Amino acid sequence: MYFKNRDEAGRQIAEILFHPYGRSKTVILAIGTGGLLVGRPIALRLQIPLYMVATKEIDLPGSYHERVGTVDQAGDFVYSSNLTQGQVDDYVGEYHNHIEAEKIEAMHEINRMMGSTGFVDKAQLYEHNIILVSDGLKTAVDLDAVMAFLKPVKIFRMIGATPIASIDAIDRLHILTDEIRVLSPKENYLETDHYYEENNLPSDEEAMQMLEALGHNPYVEA
C-alpha cells in the first residue's frame, strides 16, 4: 500500500480509531515530525490532544550505519532491542567514545529543536490512553526509546498506530502495546519515504508552529 502523503495516511487511521477513542480520555504521542503529520488528522478527527516526543538515533561509524540505540528528550539512552547483549558489549568496548559523543550531540539537537517553547508535564499523560503514532516503523528502536520514556507514567491503554511497519516492528508492537493499528505490514521494508508520493516534512520550527496552532504545547516533559 502506498499513500499520497502522511496526512492521507493519518486520515485513514483516524477513521479506524474514531469510535473507540474519539472524544475520550486519550492523547496522541507522535514520534518525530513524520509522526506529527500522521497524528494531526487523527487528533482533529478524534478531538483529542496531540503531543510530540523527540528522539535522536545513534549510529555506529562506517558505511553500514548500524543503529545502536536512541536518545530521548530526557537524555536517556536505550540500546536497540535488535542487538544481542554480546553485540552491545562489543560496541561499548570498541565505540565507547563515539557513542558518548553522539549522545551529547543528540541532546544538543533536541534542545535546539525544543527552543524556548517549554514542556508539557507528564501529568498530561497520566491515566490516559496513549496512541503512539509514527509515519513508518522499519525497526523497533524508536519504540523502545519512547516506551522507556513512558515507563514511569501510569496509563490506561497503549495503542500503536502507523501506516507502515516491518514484520519485526509489528512483533515488537505486540509486546509493547495493548493494541496495534498498521495499515500496511511490509515483509521487505524499504525506506519510509518510499511509501509516500509526497515527502515534505516540516522543519523543527514549522513543527512547533503546527502544534501551537492546534492549541497544545509541543513536548512532553521528561
Sequence positions of predicted segments:
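PRPP-associated nucleotide enzymes
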Residues: M1-A222
